[in-house]
């Protein structure tokens, strides 16, 4: 995937990034032709665990982390976009192609997620340095991140609608 971290000002200090007063956004653009729900879950569960020393004692954050790792109902496709954002003293949110997947109070969830990129075991050393602005980012990648157009809007809400229809049909039997 292609990833971007957006902050109000360029800053590579984790304390600044983790601060509840800092607005922040992670952008993930799927680059592989197909990313299975199973593989998505494996990668994110692993990255969350190895980059966060303690698992949150907040049950809402635990539930949000689990929801994040399990939300794809079908394969993600090249061009799908996942946004994880946080507004100061507000909520952390995850969106898939513009659809709200989850929302949880505070910055703890966002910080667990961003730590998968800037923590002790990021995807690669170069990835971490690029995310933190410590190395020049490939201009084509930067352009792709900044000009990305959502291609499969309504994907998540479609999955949920199908699940609800199936549940309703089962209840009516």
List the predicted regions and their residue ranges.
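Terminal leader/tail segments of proteins
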Residues: 1-96, 100-173
């Amino acid at each position: 995937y292609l990833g971007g971290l957006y902050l109000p000002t360029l800053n590579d200090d984790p304390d600044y990034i983790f601060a509840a007063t800092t607005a922040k956004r992670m952008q993930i653009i799927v680059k592989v032709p197909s990313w299975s729900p199973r593989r998505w879950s494996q990668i994110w569960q692993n990255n969350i665990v190895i980059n966060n020393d303690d698992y949150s004692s907040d049950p809402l954050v635990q539930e949000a982390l689990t929801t994040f790792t399990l939300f794809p109902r079908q394969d993600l496709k090249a061009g799908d976009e996942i946004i994880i954002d946080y507004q100061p003293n507000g909520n952390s949110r995850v969106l898939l192609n513009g659809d709200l997947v989850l929302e949880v109070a505070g910055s703890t969830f966002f910080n667990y997620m961003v730590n998968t990129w800037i923590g002790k075991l990021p995807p690669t050393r170069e990835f971490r340095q690029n995310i933190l602005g410590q190395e020049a980012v490939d201009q084509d990648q930067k352009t792709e991140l900044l000009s990305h157009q959502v291609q499969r809007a309504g994907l998540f809400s479609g999955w949920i609608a199908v699940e609800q229809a199936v549940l309703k049909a089962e209840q009516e039997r």
